[in-house]
Amino acid sequence: MAVYNYDVVVLGSGPAGEGAAMNAAKAGRKVAMVDSRRQVGGNCTHLGTIPSKALRHSVKQIIQFNTNPMFRAIGEPRWFSFPDVLKNAEMVISKQVASRTSYYARNRVDVFFGTGSFADETSINVVCTNGVVEKLVANQIIIATGSRPYRPADIDFSHKRIYDSDTILSLGHTPRKLIIYGAGVIGCEYASIFSGLGVLVELVDNRDQLLSFLDSEISQALSYHFSNNNVMVRHNEEYEKVEGLDNGVILHLKSGKKIKADALLWCNGRTGNTDKLGLENIGLKANGRGQIEVDETYRTSVSNVYGAGDVIGWPSLASAAYDQGRSAAGSMVDNGSWRYVNDVPTGIYTIPEISSIGKNEHELTQAKVPYEVGKAFFKGMARAQISGERVGMLKILFHRETLEVLGVHCFGDQASEIVHIGQAIMSQPGEANTMKYFVNTTFNYPTMAEAYRVAAYDGLNRLF
């Protein structure tokens, strides 16, 4: 067994692992990266964020072509199969892998492909993909192994008609009807993708509202948009059993209902990838969801072991994971780059997009904060009329006395980009965080950014 010595070993090359490895390397540490795949990038690049967003982009282009009257001169609406749109996602994945591989090489981070597990608090045994076992010894170790879809034991995921959010990328046909169980972020995003391909979607939600953490008006807008686009949402339903057939699948619900479709996509929960890490060898224990507990510096109960990304739970976003990994390494090497990552924008890539940051109306009402609301509807924006993306709105919540911006919520095209203007103002200290910025600033015209000015005037006009 070959033995290699490092200052830092990072387990997992997703966003959290990458952020950690790069920051530690920039601080002059000798760093090794271990990943169970034969390529870097983690689930985010290969099965999650990147392929699903690439799929969404392709589907959105198809929708634009099929709904724009200008293109009728070219021909009738055209439809593409799921495997067809998947080809573009595969090209994006290859480009991402190439880029990220170059990052590690440029920063002189050694990458080991294989399954890593703790031998003790300072040693990692790596069973490489070629079967060779190598030992990595390090002063400090960061766990960034991510998560995977939760799979109930009573569901046969080997059945050819039953998928989860990892295996759905192997779907070789376009189903006429699809059941999606679980209406969280992943479930809603795939509901948009498949409905955009003309698939009838049954979206089964075990709660009474879609994405209940969102501002209720935004959640309602998504529900309304789904109902107009081949998505049947069923709230307050729980599965009793899943019956796989040769020609489809039947979902039996505890309410007594039965739903039949060509395929089922399971999107109900995720579990941390900790079961093969040998945590018992260092006295560390994961919770029931496979997640490990860390403090505000991302340190676990083992003093030289840190955690970041999905494996530590909330908020389970790629954007936050990268910052958590970078901050964990910053805490570890003490180079001033540590921060506790808690003020994170939400980006949900449905069609149209949803994004938000800060408080929603329910939270402000519960806290008895005197707030006011300003809105800008995209249908009245010149840029939206030009692009044909007229569905959506920008909503700003602000303190009616100090004019401090308290929350920004957006539903519509480019929402995940638009929200960052509000985020930048909300991060300003003291009186610099004010609605006055939006009315005293000249925005390019026509842009979607000027929705902030429209929403600001709308809100300020409500004051008395």
From Swiss-Prot:
Q: What EC numbers are recorded for this enzyme?
A: 1.6.1.1
Name where it's found.
Cytoplasm
Which GO-annotated molecular functions does the record name? dihydrolipoyl dehydrogenase (NADH) activity; flavin adenine dinucleotide binding; NAD(P)+ transhydrogenase (Si-specific) activity
Gene symbol of the encoding locus: sthA
Keyword Oxidoreductase listed? The answer is yes
Query: This protein is called what?
Result: Soluble pyridine nucleotide transhydrogenase
**Alphabetical list of NCBIfam families matching this protein:** PRK05249.1
Q: Where does this protein come from, organism-wise?
A: Pseudomonas syringae pv. syringae (strain B728a)
A GO BP term, please?
2-oxoglutarate metabolic process
Q: Which residues bind FAD?
A: 35-44
Q: Which family does it belong to?
A: Belongs to the class-I pyridine nucleotide-disulfide oxidoreductase family.
Q: Which UniProt keywords apply?
A: Cytoplasm, FAD, Flavoprotein, NAD, NADP, Oxidoreductase
- A Gene Ontology term for the protein's cellular component: cytosol
A Pfam family reported for this protein in Swiss-Prot or TrEMBL: Pyr_redox_dim
Q: What is its main location?
A: cytoplasm
| Cofactor(s) listed in the protein's UniProt record | FAD
Question: Which reactions is this enzyme annotated as catalysing?
Answer: NAD(+) + NADPH = NADH + NADP(+)
What does the record give as the function of this protein? Conversion of NADPH, generated by peripheral catabolic pathways, to NADH, which can enter the respiratory chain for energy generation.
- Annotated TM spans: none
What InterPro entries does the entry give? Answer: Class-I_Pyr_Nuc-Dis_Oxidored, FAD/NAD-bd_sf, FAD/NAD-binding_dom, FAD/NAD-linked_Rdtase_dimer_sf, Pyr_nuc-diS_OxRdtase, Pyr_nucl-diS_OxRdtase_dimer, STH_gammaproteobact
- Report if keyword Transferase is assigned: no
Cofactor note text: Binds 1 FAD per subunit.
